[in-house]
Amino acid sequence: MPEAAIEFDKVKKSYGEKTVVDGLSFHVAPGECFGLLGPNGAGKTTTLRMLLGIAAPDAGTIRLCGEPIPRRARVARARVGVVPQFDNLDPDFTVRENLLVFGRYFGMSAAQCRAMVPPLLEFARLESKADARVSELSGGMKRRLTLARALVNDPDVLIMDEPTTGLDPQARHLIWERLRSLLARGKTILLTTHFMEEAERLCHRLCVIEEGRKIAEGAPSALIASEIGCDVIEIFGPDPVALRDELAPLVERTEISGETLFCYVIDAQPVHARLKQRADLRYLHRPANLEDVFLRLTGREMQD
């Protein structure tokens, strides 16, 4: 593998008058899990399309597995596995047949395809479903099959768009466990996700983008420390604006989202004492997390 598995350098992309990606730069090291986070319309999908050579950038440089994109996208994609946001499995085939057919797309012989199926079924924990139709699988099983299919060519890099969207918590945790096993084997993962817990658990580093521009980058723990840096008390009740004014002298800063007041505190005791006098309020005291960072950077009303 080259020094960087993925390189984006000052990449721009517009559609008509709308700039979708605006000078975006990031790199992903071999063996790293790197997350792209951003609200809907931030440019994440366009970024992935350019990385795979499906869309050409208007400016900037892209390299995937050391290959210039889009000029040598076909060569690079031979070393890449892709997990799309929505499962595109063939419903007319069994679990085993979906893997066999996909292997032939990479020029593998019939014998090679047959040999790679058992370990992939074991990886996806689908051994007992090898001859089941796709329509017979649960959502979590379909997602694990899609992940196994992306590994048919033993790729160096996995590109995953919202890998656990629509899954229940148990299925989501199983996917996370499988992804951690891939990282332990030295695979490189680039993923987009709306689940902040997913990003915090899996990603070594993150890039937060909004309107096609990078607004923050770093390790999850470092971003939490730099952007939040203290505990959070969520308060649920009537008139959050009046409550904000009441508590302002006791907290570092506040944010309002709907009917919820977020108080950022270094010393929580004075706030707790005040809240205990208010039977009409419910509250939760917790450590800051990546969701606080994401919402602060991309869209919640901030009050200093």
UniProtKB/Swiss-Prot annotation:
InterPro entries given in the database record: AAA+_ATPase, ABC_transporter-like_ATP-bd, ABC_transporter-like_CS, ABC_transporter_ATP-binding, ABC_transptNodI, P-loop_NTPase
Cellular component, GO annotation: plasma membrane
Positions annotated to bind ATP: 38-45
EC number(s) reported in the record: 7.6.2.-
Entry coiled-coil feature ranges: none
Top EC class, one word: translocase
Database matches in Gene3D superfamilies: P-loop containing nucleotide triphosphate hydrolases (3.40.50.300)
Record key words, sorted: ATP-binding, Cell inner membrane, Cell membrane, Membrane, Nodulation, Nucleotide-binding, Translocase, Transport
Membrane topology reported for the UniProt record: Peripheral membrane protein
PROSITE patterns found in the cross-reference section: ABC_TRANSPORTER_1 (PS00211), ABC_TRANSPORTER_2 (PS50893), NODI (PS51240)
Pfam family, one: ABC_tran
Domain ABC transporter: 6-236
SMART domains tied to this protein: AAA (SM00382)
Compartments, as annotated in UniProt: Cell inner membrane
Entry GO MF terms: ATP binding; ATP hydrolysis activity; transmembrane transporter activity
NCBIfam families hit by this protein: nodI, PRK13537.1
Family classification: Belongs to the ABC transporter superfamily. Lipooligosaccharide exporter (TC 3.A.1.102) family.
Free-text function comment from the UniProt entry: Part of the ABC transporter complex NodIJ involved in the export of the nodulation factors (Nod factors), the bacterial signal molecules that induce symbiosis and subsequent nodulation induction. Nod factors are LCO (lipo-chitin oligosaccharide), a modified beta-1,4-linked N-acetylglucosamine oligosaccharide. This subunit is responsible for energy coupling to the transport system.
Oligomer status and interactors: The complex is composed of two ATP-binding proteins (NodI) and two transmembrane proteins (NodJ).
Entry protein name: Nod factor export ATP-binding protein I
Organism: Paraburkholderia xenovorans (strain LB400)
